Structure formats: structure tokens, C-alpha cells
Amino acid sequence: MRDNALAVSGLLVGRAGGPGVKPYQPPGLWNEVSLGGNVRFRQDTGENLYRKSMYTYWKRSAPAPSMTIFDAPTREKCMVERPRTNTPLQALVTLNDPQFTEAARNLAQRMIKEGGQTAQDRVTYGYRLVAARKPKPIVANILVAAYNEELENFKKNTEAADKLLDVGESKRDETINNAEHAAWTIVASMLLNLDEVITRL
């Protein structure tokens, strides 16, 4: 799911091979499980933040929380099939984890710059990127209405827009209006959290 979000946002680095990477993780990770607290988690920067999940550095006593929440195997033995679960924690990851928020911001930027001039065109473009099909008219209308509502909210609360757009290390296009970009980021997050995008049966 993380790789999919990074791919549609244009952030995914597809380079193969190399050492393990350390993407965004909660502060204080490893402090409780390292011997004497002498091993600290040091987050990577640059393109290492956007490598495929299979390259994520794995500490057996403190695996990446976002991967654990989605039932990633412990790597102690081979797993032929992963268990299927659905918990509120998973939604919290896809809605709030910096990697997903940053991916939504970059997907929003793609929708604005590549998706056309109207909100309807941008919604259709974003939907096709994440779901590989056009949205039904009723769904597109709901997403456009959500955009308009969020745009009004962010115009009134510019600090919230700035805070949302500051998530993540990737550079954003500063020529895009902050309120507009933040509103599209919310819509992009909604798209990345669609059931058909995050569930494979």
C-alpha cells in the first residue's frame, strides 16, 4: 500500500538493490529496545525515504510500526499467505502517517498540474491514477463537493493549510495556492483511502 501511494504520487524511487533504508518512523523508535539506549533510529533523507518497502531496514525487536499494523510477517519464517485484518489502526496509518500524507500532497500536486483546469477534470484524473478507472458521476460529485468545502475551510484557516503542506521532505510547487493545494491534498487522501485502492481480493 505504501509503495502504491508513493507510485501514484510520483515519489517512488524504483532503483533496485542497495542497503536497507529508514523511512519516516515515530520519534523514539528503538529507544526502549536497544541495549542501554545506545542505538538510535536515524531517519534517512532524500530518495531513501521513497524506496520500495522491501528495502526498509528491519529491526526484529522493533519492526516498522506501520508495517506491523498491516500484518507484515515477522520474517522469522516464510509466509505463503498473509492474514487479512481490518482494524481502526490501519485507517489511522493511511490517514495520518507522514508517508501517506506526503504522498497525498504530491498526488494533489499532480492532479492540479496534470489533471486539467476544472475540479471535475482533476477528480477524474486523480481517480484514474489510483483506481485505473473513471469515477462514477455520483462519486465524482461527492469528491468535488469535498474539495469545495475544504477549500473554504483552508481559506479561513491558512495555518492549517501550511501545516498540512509542510508534512514530508519532498519539495512542493510553491506557485500553487496553499489553500487550493491543501484542499486537493485532502481529496487525494480520500482517493488513497478508497476501499478499492487499499484492498486486493
Segments and roles (model prediction):
Residues 138-142, 163-166, 176:
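Long, internal low-complexity/basic segments
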Residues 152-156:
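Extracytoplasmic/periplasmic ligand-capture domains
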Residues 109-142:
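Amphipathic alpha-helical substructures
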Residues 1-122, 159, 167-201:
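An acidic, gly/pro-interrupted, aromatic-rich
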